Every structure is written in C-alpha cells, then in structure tokens.
Amino acid sequence: IAGAYEKRKVIGFDLNKNNLDCIKEALDNYIEPVQTQPTSSENVNYELIHDCGVEMVKFKEASNMIDLFINDIPYILSAEKYTDDPRDLCNIKDLDGFYERVEVMMKNMKRLIKTSNYEEGVIKPIIMKVGSQRRGNKGLMTMDTDIEMIGRKIGLTLHDKIINELRPSMQSYIINTSFQKRFTMKIMETNLIFVKYE
C-alpha cells in the first residue's frame, strides 16, 4: 500500500483471497483518490494475483523486472493457518519441506529482482520479515539463520539485517514461564535485506 501511495507499480501475490480483497479496497478507496490529480496522468498501478507467491507462475519467463520485494512469510512449523491451500507455506509442518519451498521462492525472487550496484549506490532489495519460535526442549528456532544460509547458497548477498522490537499485549503472561524456563521473552522479529550483485 505504501508503494502505491508513492506511485509505484505494485504486484501482490496471496493465496488468501480475503487479503487481496482488503488490499484492493484500500488501494481503490484510499490511495487512488489521493494520487489521482486532475492535472496528473499518473494513477495507482497495481496487480493483485490470487496465486502462489512461491512459484509466481505468472512471471516464470521474466527476469530483472522488480525494484523491491517485501515479503512476510508464515512462521515455521505451521504456527498459524491462513488458508487450506497445500501450496501455502503455513500448511507445511515439516521444517525441511518448509525451507525447500522458501528456497524455491527465493530463487524466483532472485531471478525477478533487478541487479544492485554497490559502487553506484543502487540497491534493489529483497526484504523478508521473519520470526522465531520456542519449541520446548528443541530450543529456539530462528528463521533468520536458515534463510540467510539459503540466500548465501543461491548467490544472494545479505545487505542488512534489522531487528524489530515487538510489544505484544500478552507479554506479561509469559514472564513467569520465561523465569521458570530460564529464557528471555521473544519480543522481536527480524528483517533480512538481500540484494543481487553481478
């Protein structure tokens, strides 16, 4: 939505039709009227695609066409359910299977993102917001580590890493458990910023 407000072309994939409908409503009712001036020929330009954002089939023959990817994939181990579609990452309970699909998605994003140029200060980022989960005696599983390794494997460069502090309303309820189990509260998510260099 922020991209549309800045008059950028927006392409969105989601397997949840309701999400796409909500975005479309916001773009049509709030962004487009603000951006469309009587003297301007620039209108909001967007394409919302009700399909798998891993495969991105519509763009399977394309390359070097995207200036920026913003991506918020589901947590690992089917922590939250968004659809019943088996292609949806939220439905993959197997950790290895989940990351195999993430690798497919990242390869597609690498193919589609434009090339960055460090010397000239041209950055065409792939921004992925990821989280972590505590799994009892299996410990803390952080998605950023695994996704950084996938990025390195497929030839993406980790340009930056941003830690976002969360302020969950239920935070006070987990303080006791945190003390008893001797771990800190999970109050952060991570943004990984990848780029593709020649």
For the regions a language model picked out, list residue spans one by one.
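Class I S-adenosyl-L-methionine-dependent methyltransferase catalytic core
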Residues: 1-198
